[in-house]
């Protein structure tokens, strides 16, 4: 099963997501729709209708899958978005463009109708654009076969999925709402209840053409009933472009629309008239004219026939069926009919249940999108995001200007979590209040519950209010009367907690009476309880009428607090009520958006609250005052502006720093945060008074909620430039922010990313510090946590938005960093003594190179930053490094030798990281060959051993990658060009240096030889270059020097290279033999085989086996070559040519030492690896054919036992035959071997079992061979 890589999300619906994707192992991009399984009927319908359709104006279906949680639909990727998006962006399209788009629509729909398919729900969001502007029909969820009942089909699929047909009627009823499309484009007859038809689809096309030209559909209304009435009764207005400067509609276009938008389907244009219409300017002149309904039916019948038949017979069959009165919808072929839904199943039903992990999430970050994907009516809006058009635009696609970036950032400064409002009154975090209780026995009025009060009739409500007011207004002549009044007030506290009751009581005469008693009641207990009732009413009321005397209450409460300011208990009673009233006025004013003069209250209220904040007050009073400011400043109102003073920031900061209760500390900093939302100078005043270091220390040591508010404060201040230069230069501040990325709180991490983004926008150098502090690691961690396709909680969604902006900025910043580095190097290029300005520039820019390394080693950034532009810049930097290394340019004096070496090392390391991911270089092969490899080749000549080795390693590995990569369609020519450039580079520059490179200490020869291996394996012509460069003797010298470490990298490369050279048909074998190829192979094979046969030495066994196979491959090529020469000599012997015979004899003489390997090859035959047996047996066969039984140890007792074991254990007749032929050749060419066989009892028994008449099945070739050998030994 092949997996898919998912890239960015390009569309989303309530139950579906569309991703841009790629099949793993290919470069073919597709659109992948992931949908909930509840959408199975729609998706199944899409698949069964389109699975075999191939048309340029219809989105191609590829395949579909079912995993444990989702259905996955893989279709053609359209890169131009939807027609709806185009219309929305351009508002209206010129008539020429409408014609071009219309031709695509007509072509696609005509093809569908010829197949008997009705699209049914044609709308702009279901029409997608391919790159060059071709329109394609997509989303066939609601399409159907003509004459079919789609509700029944949906119910059938759903019932099948449910495991039976129980409740089928219920299913059909539930499907009615699912088969309805967009009413805006629905034909009048369908609105009346008729079935969809060819004619209704043509009406929808007319609506589309109208909307493309005018920018709006012919009929539109927010009200469904009004829209229906317009479609059924009104004629569309003439199409007029939104842009008045555009030309009016032509008479042809108007006539076409009139024909398509006829309410009577009988008068509507048919296919024949539509295709011949003059508006198309004969675009369909060569089209198939079988476009009437009858012709469409004939076309379907033709398609339904399963075998090759004469066209006349098909026509006769069609006519005979028509004569019998069959309707087109009754002649559905197997192509579309789905009476048994199991006929179409996603792949999981055939291949076992699949895991969601078959669709792998790319490391690439996922952009958030507001578009949706349609898989059912009213749910989705299809959208496909553009693909990259060229490598150079990979980064710039979706590039944000700094203005747009900061605009999006400002929207993220404050979240709902930062602006949560909690009650001021009865807030347990401020002060725990005793529970409110009342005694219904002494209430003297009905103790209605809240539910009862809500349903009182007006008269009963008025009576109830009158009773309440009467009791409150009664005089307190005795203690009993006071208790009764307090009891009533407690009852009011209970019912005031309900919003609707509180709203009615606040706007009743009771509220004025409560204010009066708050002023005149002689008993402070009653005053306190009255204040509490007022506060609860203000806290729970939902609206405020302008004639309600809230300002009077605020003034009164202010006076009472001011007159009794030293009475802390009284303040604790009155402050919450004052705060709730002020907050009520502020919220209502914010709703109404205009300040109300009737709600203006005196400055004394602000003064009193500010005094309550000051040092020396009880913490409860401080807390209440801070809470009031926190709530009021959440609103944008005149009341909030009253708290903005020069001292408010430091006062709240003092409360935060000197309070021990976390709840008060949180309230104080939250209030400061909300004031800063109105005026950033409030936090600026704090920093100026207490110092930035003190604020940073507080941020580092605070609890999570405080850290969230403080990060918001810093973000708000940075967004408006306050203390900007100081903050972006403060390394301790940046380090503290990065440490907060370890917080468990999603909001804190998101805000930390946002603060860092502000810093990086204005100080690029801080990106280096951030990377060194593991910023990239934190980004990768949080990118993995945010998985596309899942419903995200608000915290994760917020984190995703902040993270996306930071990633996009860093990706956009990298080219600028590289540009600065290039400029600084270009300015000093060729100079021995840079100027002071140039030195300063080098010191500022070159140390930023580690940023590149951090980004290319990140799975999030690497796919986005490695572009053609990046590789070109990187190659240019390498060219400057070559100049520095050669001494042509001197930067050591400017930045120091250590810094210079570090810069070169990091630059080379960055490319080393990139080549670990070959797919990144696939599209940029020519850029790498033309701009990166040349300076690397030059660095191979460096006097610095480290750079020489590093560059050779990079060169070797890069070349191996490039020559082994495959290219898709259209890339062959570029591949050939880059291959020729690569070959020329190595031939002209690198190979001449090999004479010195191969004699250097390890591991230099290993990398040099690895490059030769890759080139000779990929390009046979390179073999001649190796020979012409006189490298063969050097290669054998390397072999002699490294023979002791046969499993080392150098020897592995040597053997691989020799294998390529010997296997090449154009290779000069004479040269290889002259340099001692035979003796080297004998020695290497002997040593390697000994390692493989040593049962006690299991270390490096796999490596030795791989090496042995390569050596046997070389031996086989040598013997095959020799055998060919000998065969050629024997063929020419009759002609009397002595040269060929002499050459064959000389070659046989050269190869004679190889016969010593026979006694080594035989023990290798029982090897567990079948490939070892295969090549060993072939080598042994050719050796005995060429030299017979020359090796005296060929049939030693040990080897005889091996042959006996093999003939017994091997069941393949071909293998048995080969072994028997080897034995026969040995005994017929050497008497000694014949005598050895006579005494080999086990081998003779094995031969007897293979001979005819042994009682077992005998192969027609194997048995005679076994019999022949037995007869030779006299058995």
Swiss-Prot record:
<feature type="active site" description="Proton acceptor">
    <location>
        <position position="121"/>
    </location>
</feature>
<feature type="repeat" description="HEAT 5">
    <location>
        <begin position="1151"/>
        <end position="1189"/>
    </location>
</feature>
<feature type="repeat" description="HEAT 1">
    <location>
        <begin position="727"/>
        <end position="765"/>
    </location>
</feature>
<feature type="repeat" description="HEAT 3">
    <location>
        <begin position="926"/>
        <end position="964"/>
    </location>
</feature>
<dbReference type="InterPro" id="IPR016024">
    <property type="entry name" value="ARM-type_fold"/>
</dbReference>
<feature type="compositionally biased region" description="Polar residues">
    <location>
        <begin position="384"/>
        <end position="393"/>
    </location>
</feature>
<dbReference type="GO" id="GO:0004674">
    <property type="term" value="F:protein serine/threonine kinase activity"/>
</dbReference>
<dbReference type="InterPro" id="IPR056981">
    <property type="entry name" value="HEAT_ULK4_RUNKEL"/>
</dbReference>
<dbReference type="InterPro" id="IPR011009">
    <property type="entry name" value="Kinase-like_dom_sf"/>
</dbReference>
<keyword id="KW-0808">Transferase</keyword>
<dbReference type="Pfam" id="PF00069">
    <property type="entry name" value="Pkinase"/>
</dbReference>
<dbReference type="GO" id="GO:0106310">
    <property type="term" value="F:protein serine kinase activity"/>
</dbReference>
<feature type="region of interest" description="Disordered">
    <location>
        <begin position="359"/>
        <end position="393"/>
    </location>
</feature>
<keyword id="KW-0547">Nucleotide-binding</keyword>
<dbReference type="GO" id="GO:0005524">
    <property type="term" value="F:ATP binding"/>
</dbReference>
<feature type="repeat" description="HEAT 2">
    <location>
        <begin position="842"/>
        <end position="880"/>
    </location>
</feature>
<comment type="function">
    <text>May be involved in the remodeling of cytoskeletal components, such as alpha-tubulin, and in this way regulates neurite branching and elongation, as well as cell motility.</text>
</comment>
<comment type="similarity">
    <text>Belongs to the protein kinase superfamily. Ser/Thr protein kinase family. APG1/unc-51/ULK1 subfamily.</text>
</comment>
<keyword id="KW-0067">ATP-binding</keyword>
<feature type="repeat" description="HEAT 4">
    <location>
        <begin position="1025"/>
        <end position="1063"/>
    </location>
</feature>
<feature type="domain" description="Protein kinase">
    <location>
        <begin position="4"/>
        <end position="280"/>
    </location>
</feature>
<protein>
    <recommendedName>
        <fullName>Serine/threonine-protein kinase ULK4</fullName>
        <ecNumber>2.7.11.1</ecNumber>
    </recommendedName>
</protein>
<feature type="compositionally biased region" description="Polar residues">
    <location>
        <begin position="363"/>
        <end position="373"/>
    </location>
</feature>
<feature type="repeat" description="HEAT 6">
    <location>
        <begin position="1213"/>
        <end position="1253"/>
    </location>
</feature>
<dbReference type="InterPro" id="IPR045906">
    <property type="entry name" value="ULK4"/>
</dbReference>
<dbReference type="InterPro" id="IPR011989">
    <property type="entry name" value="ARM-like"/>
</dbReference>
<keyword id="KW-0723">Serine/threonine-protein kinase</keyword>
<feature type="region of interest" description="Disordered">
    <location>
        <begin position="299"/>
        <end position="346"/>
    </location>
</feature>
<dbReference type="Pfam" id="PF23606">
    <property type="entry name" value="HEAT_ULK4"/>
</dbReference>
<keyword id="KW-0418">Kinase</keyword>
<keyword id="KW-0677">Repeat</keyword>
<feature type="compositionally biased region" description="Basic and acidic residues">
    <location>
        <begin position="336"/>
        <end position="346"/>
    </location>
</feature>
<dbReference type="InterPro" id="IPR000719">
    <property type="entry name" value="Prot_kinase_dom"/>
</dbReference>
